[in-house]
Swiss-Prot record:
The keyword Plastid does not apply. InterPro entries: Ribosomal_uL22, Ribosomal_uL22_bac/chlpt-type, Ribosomal_uL22_bac/org-type, Ribosomal_uL22_CS, Ribosomal_uL22_sf. This protein binds specifically to 23S rRNA; its binding is stimulated by other ribosomal proteins, e.g. L4, L17, and L20. It is important during the early stages of 50S assembly. It makes multiple contacts with different domains of the 23S rRNA in the assembled 50S subunit and ribosome. Pfam families: Ribosomal_L22 (PF00237). Keywords: Ribonucleoprotein, Ribosomal protein, RNA-binding, rRNA-binding. Belongs to the universal ribosomal protein uL22 family. One of its GO terms (biological process) is translation. It comes from the Bacteria. Gene3D superfamilies: Ribosomal protein L22/L17 (3.90.470.10). Part of the 50S ribosomal subunit. This is Large ribosomal subunit protein uL22. GO terms for molecular function: rRNA binding; structural constituent of ribosome. PANTHER family: CHLOROPLAST 50S RIBOSOMAL PROTEIN L22-RELATED, LARGE RIBOSOMAL SUBUNIT PROTEIN UL22M.
Length: 128
C-alpha cells in the first residue's frame, strides 16, 4: 500500500499513449513491446502489422495513438519519431473455476495487462 508514485512529466519532444486491461498476460505482451522498443515509428508500425502474434494488433493501435498524440497535441514531426519507451504492467487477474474429477475444482486465472508507449522526436542532425 502507501502513496502512489507521481507520473513522470513528459518532455516537450515526447508523446504518450496508454491502454489498460488488455486481455493477455504481461509476459506475452512484453515480447511484442520489446520488439518495437527503440525503432523508428514507421518501422515499428510495419513490424507490428506483419507480426504473427495476436496481441500485436492492440499494440499497433496504441502506437498509432501515441503518434497521433505527438502530431496533434504536441506538434511533433512524425517522420522523426521513434519508440523511446514501451513498457508493460500487471493489471487485474480474473479467477475462474473449472469442474474436475471427483467433485474437485481447478483454478483458472485470466490475466490482464497495461501497456504504455512513449514516442520521442529525434534531434535534428547537424548536417541537415
Amino acid at each position: 500500500m502507501g502513496k502512489k508514485p507521481a507520473d513522470r512529466v513528459l518532455a516537450d519532444t515526447e508523446a504518450k499513449a496508454f491502454l489498460a486491461s488488455i486481455r493477455t498476460s504481461p509476459r506475452k505482451l512484453n515480447l511484442v513491446a520489446e520488439s518495437i522498443r527503440g525503432l523508428k515509428a514507421d518501422v515499428a508500425l510495419n513490424a507490428l502489422t506483419f507480426s504473427k502474434r495476436r496481441i500485436a494488433v492492440e499494440v499497433r493501435k496504441v502506437l498509432q495513438s501515441a503518434i497521433a498524440n505527438a502530431e496533434n497535441n504536441h506538434q511533433l514531426d512524425v517522420d522523426r519519431l521513434y519508440v523511446a519507451e514501451a513498457f508493460v504492467g500487471k493489471a487485474m487477474v480474473m479467477k475462474r473455476w473449472k469442474a474436475r474429477a471427483r467433485g474437485r475444482v481447478g483454478r483458472i486465472e485470466k490475466p490482464f495487462s497495461n501497456l504504455t508507449v512513449i514516442v520521442r522526436e529525434r534531434a535534428e542532425a547537424a548536417g541537415e
